[in-house]
Amino acid sequence: MVKRMHCNINLKYGVIMKKDCYTLRISLKPGFINAEQLKAIAYVIENFGDNKAHITTRQGIEFKISPEHLEEVEKILNNVGLNLGSTGNRVRQVVSCIGLECYNAIGDSVSLARRIHEEFEGVWVPRKVKINVSGCPNSCTFHRFCDIGICYRYKITINKEICTNCGKCKDFCDLNAIDWERKIIKDNCTGEGKCTGLCNAFKAERVISIFVGGKGGRIYKEGKHLIDLKNEDDVLFVIDELISLYAKFGKGRMADFVENYGIENLRNNIKELIK
C-alpha cells in the first residue's frame, strides 16, 4: 500500500491560517458522527471559537479558533476520535452516502468508504485527491465528478433462451436502455436494476464501478469509467495503484493525469493487475 504520511500539528494539514485566527478542519470518518463527538465540537466552538461551525461540501466540519488554543483544541478533539485534516495536497476526507440506511442501496457504501478513508486519507499526492462512494447509481455523492468515484450498481443481462417475447420490458426503462428486439442491454444502462423484477429473463450481477478523472469547479469534468469489480478488497487495490501512478507521474489534478496517461493505457494496466 501507499506509505502514509503521519501528521499531527502541521499548519498545512487541517489548519488554515487566517489573518487573525486559525480555521480548523476536521476530517470526519465517512457516514456518521456520534453524540460524544458533536458535544466536543460544540464545546470547542463555544469556548475557543466564535460559536459557529461550517459544514463543508465534503461532509467535514470546520471552525475558527484563536492560534494560542490550537494544541488544547486538538487534544479535546482527539480524545473523542476526531482528527484535523483534509487540506493541502493529500487524499482528502472520503465522502459517502448513508449506504444501507437507504432503501435504494445496492451495497454498503459507508463501510467501503471508511476502509478507503482509514487506508488513504492524508497520503501525499501531487494535488488534492477527492474520493466519493455511492451505494447506488442515484449518485448522491456525485461520484462521477471527483478524482476517484466509486458506485455500487448492477450489470444487467437478458437470457434470450428464457425470454418469452411478452413485451413487458419494451417501454419500461426511462433511459431506453433495453433493446427488446435484440434482447440486449445498451451501454447507457446505469445499473439500477428495477427491470430485473419484470421477469426471470433479466439477470443482475452486483458490481462496484470505479470512475477516474472527474472534478467539479468552474471547469468541471465527468469521470471516465475505469473498471467494474466484484469485491471491496479489489477496490482498495485499484485505488492504491491509481494513487501510486498519480504520485509518480502526475503533475496537475487527477483529470490531467488521466488525460496525459491515457484512459485506455490506465484501463489495460489495471486489468492486468486484477487478473
Swiss-Prot record:
It comes from Methanocaldococcus jannaschii (strain ATCC 43067 / DSM 2661 / JAL-1 / JCM 10045 / NBRC 100440) (Methanococcus jannaschii). This is Uncharacterized protein MJ0551. It comes from the Archaea. The keyword 4Fe-4S applies. The keyword S-adenosyl-L-methionine does not apply. Belongs to the nitrite and sulfite reductase 4Fe-4S domain family. Pfam families: NIR_SIR, NIR_SIR_ferr. Siroheme binds at C140. Keywords: 4Fe-4S, Heme, Iron, Iron-sulfur, Metal-binding, Oxidoreductase. GO terms for molecular function: 4 iron, 4 sulfur cluster binding; heme binding; metal ion binding; oxidoreductase activity. InterPro entries: 4Fe4S_Fe-S-bd, NiRdtase/SiRdtase_haem-b_fer, Nit/Sulf_reduc_fer-like_dom_sf, NO2/SO3_Rdtase_4Fe4S_dom, NO2/SO3_Rdtase_4Fe4S_prot, NO2/SO3_Rdtase_4Fe4S_sf, NO2/SO3_Rdtase_FeS/sirohaem_BS. [4Fe-4S] cluster binds at C97, C102, C136, C140. Disulfide bonds: none annotated.
